[in-house]
């Protein structure tokens, strides 16, 4: 397995792109992104967090809802969106909006996950585009890096 590689060009300050290779089939890795049971094992940033909610309606136009909860503070962070493209086990594209504490949702961005198989290994190419600004891109970069590491250590 390789470490997370991140690529960002200066003209794409609101887009992050990461790659990570896993010792698993494309089907296994794709399923880890779409199975509520498996998502609960890896979709969080900090060790003190857990995935309290993982709801998935895996169909084009279907929705998802993922909630990270901090064990110490009880703070909850929920992201919601809709699936735009599903091509198992090669591609997953979905919208991304954080729920706001005051109600409603924030800025919408887009996540594209490609699963590239070479037989025994699968490379995940994650592109998160349309983020609100460079600061948001940096925060999401930190979060996705942690999640991709947890995917390797806790789910595959």
Protein language model features and the residues they cover:
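Hydrophobic ligand-binding cavity/cleft-lining segments
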Residues: 1-49
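Hydrophobic pocket/interface hotspot
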Residues: 29-30, 39, 64, 83, ...
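Residues at helix-coil transition
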Residues: 34-35, 44, 88, 153-156
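Hydrophobic-ligand binding "helix-grip"
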Residues: 40-41, 45-48, 54-60, 65-118, ...
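Short helix/strand-capping connector loops at secondary-structure junctions
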Residues: 120-132
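A conserved amphipathic terminal alpha-helix motif
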Residues: 129-156
């Amino acid at each position: 397995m390789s470490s997370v590689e991140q690529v960002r060009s200066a003209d794409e300050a609101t887009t992050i792109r990461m790659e990570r290779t896993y010792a698993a089939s494309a089907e296994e890795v794709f399923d880890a992104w779409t199975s509520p049971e498996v998502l609960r094992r890896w979709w969080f940033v900090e060790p003190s967090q857990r995935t309290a909610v993982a709801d998935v309606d895996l169909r084009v136009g279907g929705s998802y809802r993922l909630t990270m909860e901090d064990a110490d503070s009880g703070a909850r962070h929920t992201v919601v969106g809709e699936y735009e493209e599903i091509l198992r086990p090669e591609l997953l594209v979905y919208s991304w909006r954080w729920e706001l504490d005051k109600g409603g949702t924030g800025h919408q961005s887009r996540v594209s996950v490609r699963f590239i198989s070479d037989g025994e290994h699968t490379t995940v190419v994650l592109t998160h585009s349309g983020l609100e600004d460079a600061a948001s891109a940096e925060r999401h970069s930190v979060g996705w890096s942690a999640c991709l590491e947890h995917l390797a250590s806790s789910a595959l």
